[in-house]
Amino acid sequence: MKKALLIIAIILGSMTAFAQNLDKTEARLIKAFLAEPAKEGTNAQALKVADINAIANIEGVTVQNGHITAIEWKDKHLGGTLNLAGFKALTKVDVSRNELTAMSVEGCTALVEVNASRNRLTEINLAGCTALQNVQVYKNRLTEIDLANTPMLEKLNVSNNLFVELSVANCFNLKTLNCQGCHLESLNVSGAQALRNLYCGYNKLTSLQLSGVEALQNLNIDDNEITTFIVSGLPSLASLICSDNNMVTLGVRNCNALLDVVCSYNDLTTFTLDDCPNVQYVDCSYNDLTQLVLSNQTFLQRLICNNNQLTMLDVSFDQALTYINCRFNQITDFRTIACDNLRMVACQWNP
């Protein structure tokens, strides 16, 4: 019995020593954060910290070998500035759904994932985070973010912030970018050669250059101010959504993997699909088109082109086509040669 008690005492003593041996700089910065005001009281009170010197015992904090490796403080009503600069063993931070106003993880060379979404951040410092792969900072008040030293970044969600311009140029490993619902007037994705998913709707973009993003699969530029948009030579592009842009001209060519095109609620007078042989769904409703030629689209199944000014519609030899909605047009020339699977044509309110 005495031997067992001795072993327990040794273990407890080791744990106490371990907690006390936390890196001094890390301990100082965490204590400073705990002293900052939260929604009610201090951050220490919000986290129900009984002893600010026992950092290793704080819920959501993981410590290994004298260094903090993870912080998970989601939805804890925390406030103020969180400074984690120089935490060399830190790999993951989740402080989403709080009221933080500023955050720094500068020099956290092991950091892989940051989630600081749904806060009140006006600034964030990611400098020197060379291992960073996933950044989620959506629904904040950021006006800028520097990604120059994040070469491993794969996922970035900065939607619903206050950016006027954003550059992910030369983020060679970036696969998914969500920057919807900001105030973007300029977006630079040049050189983001691994980019597959780009969601940049609900901004103020007047143009978008897609050079060097041949891996792109999904593109959403809904609700911007792009009047002319030419998409060419994107062999992996499967989905294009560009509604609500006041767009006058849309040209899509040499996109062999393209399946869906949604360009409704624009001012299109010109819409062309060239060398896009696998398109299955087109919605170009609520535009100003007078002619629409989509013949020889072998895999096209559904066409929505209502509320235009069409006088001619040609879907000849579209062998997979089953449904057309061409209501509210002026169609007098309707070509459906060899459309053997066409089952429904909604064509009311034409001459």
Where do the model's predicted regions map?
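Leucine-rich repeat
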Residues: 65, 87-90, 108-111, 129-132, ...
